[in-house]
A protein has these predicted regions:
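S-adenosyl-L-methionine-dependent methyltransferase catalytic core, i.e., the SAM/SAH-binding region
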Residues: 1-335
Length: 335
């Protein structure tokens, strides 16, 4: 008798080899920031190191913001409130607004206005904020929440005009603004805010209107470019950088701008001090250059001055304001 047997065991699929890169680290944006793919283990590793994963947003100084706005009701000495009207002038990812609204929902009457000029991101943030509020408290009346949260796609320099239209002039109890670009803007190379990946030289916070960074560089003269590099970013090599950026053809991408600035700073440092700048020094020079141009493209000082001028007319008696900024010039303005 001949018998036969069938092997029913199955081979485990072979594990793919780790992707190799030509250098020590991946150069491509999507490979370098793997956490943007949503892998929870990778995200947790980034968080464990004390960093913020690309593609996410952790609202900075949240406790301090609530304290200074007088909205930390668990803290002894915080003002007693039954009603509150709050305005977030820079909605962004919605992190600060979400936590502020969670506090507001404990009050009898409240209203929250979220303002952002980014027409692309405000739609996503609206869904994100409402979802976060209703998820945090399943008993929340969703219809009530959506009626009491108002989203507005506009520049915060127009907050007074919004207050007149909506009827809250002189009634704002809490205003906050987290100044500068948002995490979503820098995470998307196509917006032109980062030099870590190639993208168009855009830098507009509202991508639907206004001139791009490329258009600004094309029309501005060298003298004016030197001025904005000095005033907006305290750039010590403003003259050399302005000259290199005005050479034809004008750079059209973030990486082209970055390479020009790096070569110029390296050459100037070698000529003047006979030393080669570190990578960190070159990165900082590029970041300062892009910051100076971004501030000008978006009129950041001008719109802030307009908001500051409107504050006495916006705030209720005892109303409070919080500004978050990492820019010394903007800090001086707000003080």
């Amino acid at each position: 008798m001949i018998t036969s047997s069938v092997d029913t065991t199955t081979e485990s699929p072979k594990k793919g080899r780790r992707i190799r890169y030509s250098g020590s680290y991946p150069k491509d944006f999507k490979d370098r920031y793997k956490e943007m793919r949503g892998d929870i283990d990778t995200i947790n590793k980034v968080l464990a190191k004390g960093s913020t994963p690309a593609g996410t947003h952790v609202p900075i100084m949240l406790g301090e913001v609530l304290d200074h706005l007088g909205l930390n009701f668990t803290r002894e000495g915080t003002r007693k409130m039954k009603n509150c009207l709050a305005v977030d002038c820079t909605l962004g990812f919605g992190g600060h607004s979400t936590e502020i609204i969670k506090v507001l929902t404990t009050l009898k009457n409240w209203k929250h206005y979220g303002i952002d000029q980014d027409a692309v991101e405000i739609v996503k943030t609206k869904e994100r904020v409402i979802s976060a509020i209703t998820t945090a408290n399943p008993d929340t009346d969703t219809n009530l929440v959506t009626r009491r949260i108002s989203f507005h796609n506009q520049n915060f320099g127009e907050t007074e005009e919004l207050a007149k239209t909506e009827g809250f002039l002189g009634r704002v109890d809490a205003i906050m603004a987290d100044l500068g670009y948002s995490s979503m803007q820098i995470d998307d190379p196509k917006r032109g805010f980062t030099f870590k990946a190639q993208g168009p030289l855009d830098m507009r916070m509202d991508p639907t209107s206004g001139e791009t960074a490329f258009e600004y560089l094309s029309r501005v003269d060298r003298k004016e470019l030197v001025r904005i590099l000095e005033e907006n970013s305290d750039e010590v090599m403003s003259l050399q950088i302005a000259e290199c950026l005005k050479e034809e053809p004008i750079p059209t991408t973030t990486t082209e701008l970055s390479e020009r600035v790096r070569k110029t700073v390296k050459f100037t440092a070698l000529r003047n001090a006979n030393e080669i700048p570190t990578k960190e020094a070159l990165d900082s020079a590029v970041a300062r250059t892009m910051q100076a141009i971004r501030i000008e493209v978006n009129g950041e000082f001008r719109v802030l001055e307009k908001l500051l001028d409107a504050l006495p007319r916006l705030l209720s008696p005892g109303g409070r304001v919080v500004f978050l900024t990492f820019h010394s010039g903007i800090e001086q303005l707000t003080r």
